[in-house]
């Protein structure tokens, strides 16, 4: 193992320095990316993703706080067949979120520069390999089904109640619990027909460039309370709250992003949402500045009083 634990924004191995320990993180097909509608290539021949075994399953789902995120282990009876007929078996599902200030969103992929509140990743491996461990070393080994979360004045999303209520059982890094009877399909967007597709990488070290990404156009809706629970329940290895556990968007470098829809379905561009978007961007920028300054200032005493 590596002596130093990687992080997003603190210490020796923050995301700017990942490539020093994990060279692939400095590669040319990294994830996440900004999905720019004007550059996306429309490909109507991309068929809907075929999900099998994603519905209610009464078995056990181990859930772990791994110090970076909360991870749900998935049974290999869950699989996804993509448009070209490749079958991928599910391995685990995890989340990326913000929360370092009330307005900070934490999705990894952005759409036309807009960052969503949370991003959900369901990680799969190519069924032609015997295990995830084997597949993760292969060039066509992995696929991630990604979904973005919106929060407005939504009522509680009942499909997330059980999961969120058990976060307190895994407050500390390394803790695990077991959930019974989850419906993963219900935890995903209602409409899975439309998606963006591109070739990228894992968004955490070792950042291997063998991931076929499928980012669903439709979103998951959570209530503000649910989002705040996720943002404030878990502690990392330093016993600090896990927040802003997302990687910044990476250069596209001549890759092509395809989508099987023409424009973003039912996205209302109200003045309010535009304003929210700009405020959010300002907030993001301030947060990056804060991170940057925090690293440049010599550590006198523990700066616990930062905002």
From Swiss-Prot:
An annotated Gene Ontology molecular function: zinc ion binding
Active site (UniProt): 68
Main location: secreted
Free-text tissue specificity from the UniProt record: Major constituent of saliva.
Coiled coil, from the record: none
Catalytic activity: hydrogencarbonate + H(+) = CO2 + H2O
Disulfide bonds: 25-207
Keywords recorded for this protein, A-Z: Disulfide bond, Glycoprotein, Lyase, Metal-binding, Secreted, Zinc
InterPro entries noted in UniProt: CA_dom, CA_dom_sf, Carbonic_anhydrase_a-class, Carbonic_anhydrase_a-class_CS
Glycosylation sites: 50, 239
Requisite cofactors: Zn(2+)
Annotated positions binding substrate: 203-204
Positions bound to Zn(2+): 94, 96, 121
PANTHER family with a match to the protein in the record: CARBONIC ANHYDRASE (PTHR18952), CARBONIC ANHYDRASE 6 (PTHR18952:SF110)
Family of this protein: Belongs to the alpha-carbonic anhydrase family.
Name of the protein: Carbonic anhydrase 6
